[in-house]
């Protein structure tokens, strides 16, 4: 085999190896590799098998970039909304404990109407906890217990755009609460509510949809790798 042909084959065969070396290195390097491949694909003289190989590599890198951006956004939101979720979780736990105590006391009276009402309050409180625990980390956190000020109400009445934004926020909150309630009704929660009430720290693995008893909301906020954040500055 002529040396030139052999070298061409080596370069084409090495494309997948080069892509593998980019996986997990961050969004900046992934985007750079994608631009390199896109420039290569613009060449009219590119052999068919090399073109196919690089088109596949480009698609794979596109998926990798999406995953990297998703994880980065989740990390940033976890840090940004750590305290508000921490306090709302504590408040939701307190409300559920009170609701369960009320149900227990009401059950002893044997008044069916009161018992039914108490059960609804318990379920509502359980949904609150699920909402806080499973709120998508890639989204801006929507508070369960907001404290609207008079100035805010006045601003909403004067600003149609702000009012529409608030309506969309409330709609999203209702949607997420319905999802939480559905998981509760279908017994598909990735964690135990009793574990939450007992103070066990739960880290949720979003990719695998299961829970691991380790640090999560209750853990102190950690400092993230500055170099990684500087490199992956897509959301800054």
From Swiss-Prot:
Its main location: nucleus. GO terms for cellular component: nucleolus; preribosome, small subunit precursor. Belongs to the EFG1 family. The keyword 4Fe-4S does not apply. Residues 53-110, 161-189 form a coiled coil. This is rRNA-processing protein EFG1. It comes from Debaryomyces hansenii (strain ATCC 36239 / CBS 767 / BCRC 21394 / JCM 1990 / NBRC 0083 / IGC 2968) (Yeast). Keywords: Coiled coil, Nucleus, rRNA processing. Residues 226-236 have a biased composition (Acidic residues). Residues 146-176, 204-236 are annotated as: Disordered. It is found in: Nucleus, Nucleolus.
């Amino acid at each position: 085999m002529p040396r030139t042909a052999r070298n061409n084959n080596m370069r084409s065969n090495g494309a997948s190896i080069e892509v593998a070396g980019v996986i997990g290195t961050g969004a900046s390097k992934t985007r750079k590799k994608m631009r390199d491949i896109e420039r290569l694909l613009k060449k009219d003289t590119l052999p068919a098998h090399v073109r196919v190989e690089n088109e596949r590599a480009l698609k794979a890198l596109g998926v990798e970039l999406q995953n990297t951006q998703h994880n980065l956004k989740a990390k940033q939101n976890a840090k940004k909304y750590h305290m508000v979720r921490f306090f709302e979780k504590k408040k939701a736990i307190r409300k559920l404990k009170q609701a369960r105590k009320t149900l227990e006391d009401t059950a002893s009276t044997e008044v069916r109407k009161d018992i039914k009402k108490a059960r609804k309050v318990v379920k509502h409180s359980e949904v609150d906890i699920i909402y806080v625990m499973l709120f998508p980390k890639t989204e801006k956190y929507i508070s369960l217990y907001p404290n609207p000020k008079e100035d805010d109400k006045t601003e909403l009445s004067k600003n149609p755009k702000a009012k529409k934004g608030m309506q969309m926020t409330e709609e999203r909150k209702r949607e997420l609460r319905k999802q939480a309630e559905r998981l509760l009704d279908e017994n598909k929660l990735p964690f135990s509510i009793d574990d939450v009430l007992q103070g066990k720290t739960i880290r949720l693995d979003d990719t695998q949809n299961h829970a691991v008893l380790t640090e999560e909301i209750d853990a102190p906020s950690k400092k993230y790798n500055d170099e990684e954040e500087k490199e992956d500055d897509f959301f800054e």
